[in-house]
């Protein structure tokens, strides 16, 4: 204990505060018990209705598929039979004039 009867540790961690934390910990970890059985979780609807990693991955795959199907024609690999594949119809471009 420090001089004058003042204990700085008492301000941070008092006996009452430690007992409250212990009681809260015990209350939270207790099982729900009846006369015939003890359950770890309370009966009723489950609270696990959050978004899972699988749902996020499926959503990204759907977005990727939609973007793939809606891409512009110039990014598609196939060309129409009557259209040339390049501006020079498969031939080398003409040489630049020599000065």
From Swiss-Prot:
Keywords attached to this entry: Endoplasmic reticulum, Membrane, Transmembrane, Transmembrane helix
Positions of region (Disordered): 78-99
Membrane topology value: Single-pass membrane protein
Domain of life according to the entry: Eukaryota
Parts of the chain on the Cytoplasmic side: 71-99
InterPro entries xref list: Uncharacterised_CD034/YQF4 (IPR020309)
GO cellular component: endoplasmic reticulum; endoplasmic reticulum membrane
This protein's name: Small integral membrane protein 14
């Amino acid at each position: 204990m420090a001089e004058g009867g003042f204990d700085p540790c008492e301000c941070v961690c008092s006996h009452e505060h430690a007992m409250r934390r212990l009681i809260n910990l015990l209350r939270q970890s207790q099982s729900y018990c009846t006369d015939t059985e003890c359950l770890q979780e309370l009966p009723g609807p489950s609270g696990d209705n959050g978004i899972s990693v699988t749902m996020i991955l499926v959503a990204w795959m759907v977005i990727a598929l939609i973007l793939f199907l809606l891409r512009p024609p110039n990014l598609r690999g196939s060309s129409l039979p009557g259209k040339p594949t390049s501006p020079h119809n498969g031939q080398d471009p003409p040489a630049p004039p020599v000065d």
